[in-house]
Regions:
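Flavin (primarily FAD) cofactor-binding/catalytic cores of flavoenzymes
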Residues: 1-239
């Protein structure tokens, strides 16, 4: 402000003044859609613009990206009765809760918040965790058991056909390893600190691979599959 004290902020809902401003914009600023499928070929939106199944065209949905946004959107679409394909890349898959404690609590006591930022050039994988429906651990095998088709990473597009990487089984297995690794760290912490927390052995059960993992698709013909929408849950870049 001209007085030198306070700030004048222009917002989408008008102008406000304040003595202090906290800039908590985080890294989620500019949505990123990879230049894979040309505009106009099919209805495409970024996950930041997704609100509910009713806003989409009738028909099946391909969700690209299986982090927290992609996995929760795919789950909601499946619950709504849509045919859903989910393109799964490398990811971490922490438990939503374990032994009566939320995963955020575990990340704190296990020192995960103090881990150093990965150096430039090292792959940073997404985290698949859900707060929907009371908060549940994301399990891609269970998605498939309910009728969702899992795919590897989306690689390209030509003549109406999506090309798919052959990395689905590896990505799911590495997510499982991350899940079990965090449970093991949590168990060790409980024992070392003499905590009285309930056992939760069922959290360590990994189900059998569904057919879409055993016999993964390497191509997906959108028209043949009845897919009329693509949701890109592919993250953001900082601006």
């Amino acid at each position: 402000l001209p007085s030198g004290r306070g700030f004048r902020i222009e917002t989408s809902d008008g102008v406000v003044t304040a003595d202090h401003v906290v800039a908590a914009t985080g890294p989620f600023q500019t949505p990123v859609i990879p230049p894979v499928v040309p505009d106009g070929v099919i209805n495409q939106i970024h996950s930041c613009h997704y609100r509910n199944p009713e806003q989409l065209e009738d028909g099946g949905v391909l969700v690209v990206g299986a982090g927290s946004s992609g996995s929760q959107i795919a789950d909601e679409l499946l619950r709504s009765g849509r045919d859903v394909w989910l393109s799964v890349g490398p990811h971490d898959r922490p438990p939503r809760s374990y032994r009566g404690k939320d995963f955020v609590w575990w990340l704190g006591v296990l020192g995960k918040w103090q881990m150093k930022t990965p150096p430039a050039g090292r792959e940073h994988v997404t985290i698949a965790v859900s707060g929907a429906y009371g908060g549940k651990t994301v399990d891609f095998r269970r998605f498939a058991d309910r009728g969702m088709t899992l795919l590897g990473m989306t690689q390209g597009f030509e003549d109406g056909v999506i090309s798919v990487a052959g990395d689905l089984a590896q990505n799911v297995a590495e997510g499982d390893a991350n899940h079990l690794g965090l449970l093991a760290e949590a168990d060790a912490y409980v024992e070392a600190n003499g905590l009285d927390l309930p056992l939760e052995e069922e959290a360590k059960i990994i189900g059998p691979d569904p057919d879409c993992i055993v016999n993964p698709l390497c191509r997906l013909d959108l028209a043949e599959a009845g897919i009329t929408n693509i949701i890109w849950a592919t993250g953001y870049r900082q601006t």
